[in-house]
């Protein structure tokens, strides 16, 4: 069969028209060294700071050092089988984690993957782990309380929604116990909770999860676990991942509480990464940006106004403010709060609860030192009844500590001093509280009323605990309606004062404890 030139021309044009060119521009590089979870990559000229780099075996690394002819990246997960010469490529994405209500009641790792064996998570989307904190115009002042259920905390160092309150102390002083009790106390308050465990033993994290489940608080809580066996990169990123999960609720006009346990271990993980990346070390071998490490995290905890929520939800949620309250934990060495990381975090937060090992060992638990524990913004968020009745507690304790030190050297004390010492001892005894036994606002109000108006004066020190138990039992049994109303409103006026007085008078007249 002979083809003429016209047919050949038509055939060529047809083939050209049907020819489909599929081209893909990929930014690739080659691993030149692998050491301690850090890879150095040649190439990747267009990589961004913090960008995810795709590695062989469906793994990722995060670009942290951008140098003239190489990139330093930290591997997210195991790196034993990575070798020189392997090809990697840019993804054009920064690290994102799943967010949404489907995470509540689940235990996830830093990347938001479930590790509790309960199947896949039904998330509402993804959010970048690094987000710029809301600006000044988007914020609203802190004026709503977060009740921890601890008399010592709610009366002397109150916490407000949107506040950052540091829990600081030596190891084994009850820092985690305080934070876990605060989470348990939110089970009926509507506040969603996130517990971020950084560098802890897996058995310790499992114990925390079990306790939350036992007390009915896990359904309201997301647990982000970066245990001691995880890589330094995952420990460094865990708080940011947890914060992104908490911001989901804040930005939709809800309230959330996040606990970082603890940021000392995160700083150590970041120091390890920085030294391996050969960044110049500073004080205590920490890198120069360790302050920024914590400040950019804790600034994201805030209370945002109605306009911000309405704008974020595109008008779906109106007239609601959102908040993310942070309880960062810092572990000190031998009570040294002037070390580098503790001073940094103290200066960033809105107050601190200082737990002292001497108090803890002498049986005062929670071991709150009222002298240097402070809440800078929580006072305006405190419920009226607690604010009114707790005014004299801190003063009484401060005077007691001062007199107790003086009384050690004085043999004969006048009656006024003896009375003050006795009162201080009773207040100290009354502020003791067992773990997993949070008190409601009304219960705290009844106890504080007894302190403020001298109902403890004729009670022996050894009987204080039984007096408190019997008083709460009497109040809840005989005045249940009043207690419920006080829990709801938190108000304080002459009528409430008279009712509290009648409760105490009736109890003292009729009860044996």
Swiss-Prot record:
Documented EC number(s): 7.1.2.2
* A molecular-function term among this protein's GO annotations: proton-transporting ATP synthase activity, rotational mechanism
* Enzymatic reactions: ATP + H2O + 4 H(+)(in) = ADP + phosphate + 5 H(+)(out)
Indicate where this protein resides in the cell.
Cell inner membrane
Signal peptide location in the record? none
Site (Required for activity) location in chain: 373
- State where ATP binds: 169-176
Origin superkingdom? Bacteria
UniProt keyword list: ATP synthesis, ATP-binding, Cell inner membrane, Cell membrane, CF(1), Hydrogen ion transport, Ion transport, Membrane, Nucleotide-binding, Translocase, Transport
* Membrane topology note: Peripheral membrane protein
Question: Key word Plastid present in the record?
Answer: no
**NCBIfam families, alphabetized:** atpA, PRK13343.1
What's the subunit arrangement here? F-type ATPases have 2 components, CF(1) - the catalytic core - and CF(0) - the membrane proton channel. CF(1) has five subunits: alpha(3), beta(3), gamma(1), delta(1), epsilon(1). CF(0) has three main subunits: a(1), b(2) and c(9-12). The alpha and beta chains form an alternating ring which encloses part of the gamma chain. CF(1) is attached to CF(0) by a central stalk formed by the gamma and epsilon chains, while a peripheral stalk is formed by the delta and b chains.
Q: Which family does it belong to?
A: Belongs to the ATPase alpha/beta chains family.
Q: What is this protein called?
A: ATP synthase subunit alpha
What's the source species for this entry?
Haemophilus influenzae (strain PittGG)
Q: What high-level taxonomic lineage is stated for the organism?
A: Bacteria, Pseudomonadati, Pseudomonadota, Gammaproteobacteria, Pasteurellales
